[in-house]
């Protein structure tokens, strides 16, 4: 059994602001990340799959198919977007990298079988680096 990871990147802006909390509490909680006009990140995401090497091809997955899935579900909808305003999932959910990781994982998981219809490979985990020092990881089995 192998784990294979492929790396992608996109740029997006966001503002950390919880609607259910007041202005002062938002400022206290999120600091400069709560600035009204937002700020940007060059996100690096790593998508990991697991599975055996296919007997015929000697490969775990077709990276071209994975690229197509990630492009359609993540890069096209998120790149050069404002996450709060332009991604429906973040109208009411704060676009922290924790929540972004869940949203990316959910999108890939939901559409995985259309690109990889067989038993293998399976989506294993998503890792997202918001900055060089802030890295978030979630396993596909942990979300619905
Ligand atoms: Ni930020």
What positions do the PLM features span?
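Charge-rich, low-complexity N-terminal segments
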Residues: 1-144
């Amino acid at each position: 059994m192998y784990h294979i990871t492929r790396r992608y990147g996109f740029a997006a802006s966001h503002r950390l602001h919880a609607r259910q909390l007041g202005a002062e509490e938002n400022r206290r909680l999120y600091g400069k990340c709560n600035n009204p006009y937002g700020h940007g990140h060059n996100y690096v995401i790593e998508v990991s799959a697991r599975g055996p090497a296919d007997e015929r091809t000697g490969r775990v997955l077709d990276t071209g198919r994975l690229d197509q899935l990630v492009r359609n579900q993540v890069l096209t909808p998120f790149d050069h977007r404002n996450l709060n305003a332009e991604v429906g999932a973040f109208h009411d959910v704060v676009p922290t990298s924790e929540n972004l990781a869940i949203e990316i994982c959910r999108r890939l998981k939901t559409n995985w079988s259309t690109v990889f219809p067989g038993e293998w490979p399976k989506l294993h985990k998503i890792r997202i680096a918001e900055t060089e020092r802030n890295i978030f990881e979630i396993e596909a089995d942990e979300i619905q």
